Amino acid sequence: AIVAGMAIGLIGAWRRGTRLDAGILMLALFTWALPTFFMGIILVLLLGRGRLPVGGMVTPGLEPADGLAYWIDVGEHLVMPTIAMAIVYTGEYILIMRSGVMEVLAEDYILTAKAKGLSTLRILRDHALKNAMLPMVTMIALTFGYTVGGAIQVETVFSWPGLGRLMYDSVQKRDYPVLQGTFLLLAVTVIIANLLADILYSVLDPRVKAE
């Protein structure tokens, strides 16, 4: 989702004002507005008719001792939950990346690079992308927390035995110690993600390192 959102957002910003940009913007807004559980239900209806497994983590009867067949089966069960969450978050990344690149492309040094005759690819790669990554780094760090909220819905739709499903079941059973543990894990994950984001900031923006 991150790679796709960055690439599509970059293209949309470079071709801003065109039909391609309008199509990308509509696609991003549409996918961003979709609830993750609704996306999961749509995938079940489209891909679940004998093509891919629609629930659980593994086909009943398979064990880790079965070797490669077990892990292939787990991968097949993971396809639809992964796609459901990736589609929704891709739209958000497209909008953030598009906005960041459009802001950078209006800077004077981009106009100077164009005046020097640099190619479009080099301008985007060497000048625009790095500076437009700062808002993306923040959003990626915040997504770690949001992902658990989306995972609760997706794991419930697909009956996937993960952290989100554990939180959902704990709420239903009023199992407060388990809820406290999952909330603590979530908080630690968000703190670590924000710490990594601050470190990446210093790498991408030397002014942060100087401060």
Where in the sequence are the language-model features?
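Membrane-water interface segments at the C-terminal ends of transmembrane alpha-helices
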Residues: 26-56, 77, 84-90
